[in-house]
């Protein structure tokens, strides 16, 4: 895996970490909404990255 792959994994891990902290800290957190938002955002980024190839 190249430098780009390592950077991408680092960014995704950081986003997931922030989402986990937000869920833990907030007493009125919408856990399902947070997870859906994170996966939707990741899906959109992945689609954008693969658009020129497909």
Swiss-Prot record:
GO BP term, pick one: symbiont entry into host cell
Keyword Phosphoprotein (UniProt): no
Subcellular location as annotated: Virion membrane
InterPro entries in the record: DNA_delivery_prot_P32/34
UniProt KW keywords: Capsid inner membrane protein, Membrane, Transmembrane, Transmembrane helix, Viral genome ejection through host cell envelope, Viral penetration into host cytoplasm, Virion, Virus entry into host cell
Primary location recorded for the protein, binned into one broad class: virion
One Pfam family recorded for the sequence: PRD1_DD
GO cellular component labels: membrane; viral inner membrane; virion membrane
Taxonomic superkingdom: Viruses
TM region(s), chain numbering: 4-24
Topological relation to the membrane, as annotated: Single-pass membrane protein
Known role: Component of the phage injection machinery. Required for DNA injection in the membrane transformation event. Involved in the formation of the membrane tail tube to connect the virus interior with the host cytosol. Essential for viral infectivity.
Note: PRD1 virions are composed of a tail-less icosahedral capsid of diameter 63 nm, an inner protein-lipid membrane, and a dsDNA genome which is located inside the lipid vesicle. The DNA is packaged into a preformed procapsid. The internal membrane plays an active role in DNA delivery to the host cell by forming a tubular structure used for injecting the DNA into the host cytoplasm.
Name of the protein: Protein P32
